[in-house]
Every structure is written in structure tokens, then in C-alpha cells.
């Protein structure tokens, strides 16, 4: 792992971050899943979703990792669920995802669960390395993308 050259800080995201966060979500999904059709939702729909259903909801938290005012990645979670860790493609493998997971674990003392697509081997490997365990695998028939996925869980002390 090559550390990033700039100092990275994590802060709670706010409404002012919605466009950057939603666009980063779109970009990272395209990079992580080149084999998947991306017409399930447009970039504008992602922005609208993050604006209406994430950034303004009291039970949703977005943690952004930034350096010099630039958002490099983010984590989106609820009290029991991690929607995902999203890091700019050109910055993967530099500890930003682990930094975000540190914050998620610190703010979820009872643990959390997440879903990861089987095809996202880098994320799956990171989550296993961080101590998450596989709970369930599906054929993807229950998700919008119809892609096989894995439910994983992290419990403190495991």
C-alpha cells in the first residue's frame, strides 16, 4: 500500500457535498463494475437520490475523506448498515478506504452489515482483511443489477 502524499482528514459530509459525493459514487461504480450495465440509474438520478434520500436524512451518515478541500472518497452508512466505501479510482490502495472503515467502526460500536458484489474482488478482499465475515451469498435476483452479491458483517472483537 502506498500512502497518499497529502494529509487526509475525515469529516461528516453535508448538503454542500451532494454533487461531488454522488458523482464519485457514479464514477467508482463504473470503474468497479465495467461488466455491468450502468443504465440502472443515471448520474442525475444518483445526485437526486443522494440529495433527497441520503444527505438530508437523520439516520444516514456520509463520511468524506478529503485533502486540501478535495473529496477523495466517502462512506455512506445508517445505524446498522454500511452502504459502501467509495474511493477515487486513481487513489485506491493508498489507505483511504481503511481510514474510512476506521471511522465507520468507531461510530458503529455494535457492528454493521454490508452487501458487496461478487465481482468487486478488491472491496471483498478489503472487507475480509478488516475482519468482516461472509453471512450470505445470493445469485443477485434480489438486487437492481441482478448481479451475484455477498452480505458481510463486522462485529467488534471478531
Regions found by a protein language model. Name each.
Residues 9-23:
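A short beta-loop-alpha structural element at the N-terminal edge
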Residues 26-52:
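Conserved GNAT-fold acetyl-CoA-binding loop/helix
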Residues 52-64, 81:
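A short helix-loop-beta-strand connector motif used in the catalytic cores of GNAT acetyltransferases and
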Residues 64, 70-86:
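Conserved beta-strand in the GNAT
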Residues 81-92, 116-117:
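A short, internal acetyl-CoA/4′-phosphopantetheine-binding micro-motif in the GNAT/acyltransferase core
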Residues 90-103:
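Conserved acetyl-CoA pyrophosphate-binding loop and the N-cap/start of the following alpha-helix
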Residues 98-99, 119-137, 143-147:
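Conserved active-site alpha-helix within GNAT-family acetyltransferase domains
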Residues 107-119:
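Conserved GNAT acetyl-CoA-binding A-motif
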Amino acid at each position: 500500500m502506498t500512502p497518499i502524499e497529502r494529509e487526509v482528514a475525515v469529516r461528516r459530509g453535508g448538503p454542500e457535498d451532494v454533487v461531488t459525493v454522488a458523482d464519485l459514487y457514479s464514477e467508482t461504480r463504473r470503474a468497479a463494475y465495467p461488466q455491468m450495465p450502468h443504465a440502472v440509474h443515471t448520474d442525475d438520478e444518483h445526485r437526486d437520490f443522494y440529495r433527497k434520500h441520503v444527505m438530508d436524512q437523520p439516520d444516514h451518515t456520509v463520511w468524506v475523506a478529503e485533502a486540501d478541500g478535495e473529496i477523495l472518497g466517502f462512506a455512506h452508512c445508517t445505524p446498522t448498515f454500511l452502504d459502501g466505501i467509495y474511493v477515487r479510482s486513481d487513489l485506491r490502495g493508498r489507505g483511504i478506504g481503511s481510514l474510512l472503515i476506521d471511522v465507520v467502526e468507531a461510530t458503529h460500536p455494535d457492528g454493521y452489515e454490508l452487501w458487496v458484489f461478487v465481482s468487486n474482488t478488491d472491496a471483498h478482499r478489503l472487507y475480509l482483511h478488516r475482519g468482516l465475515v461472509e453471512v450470505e451469498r445470493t445469485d443477485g435476483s434480489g438486487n437492481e443489477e441482478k448481479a451475484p452479491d455477498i452480505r458481510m458483517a463486522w462485529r467488534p472483537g471478531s
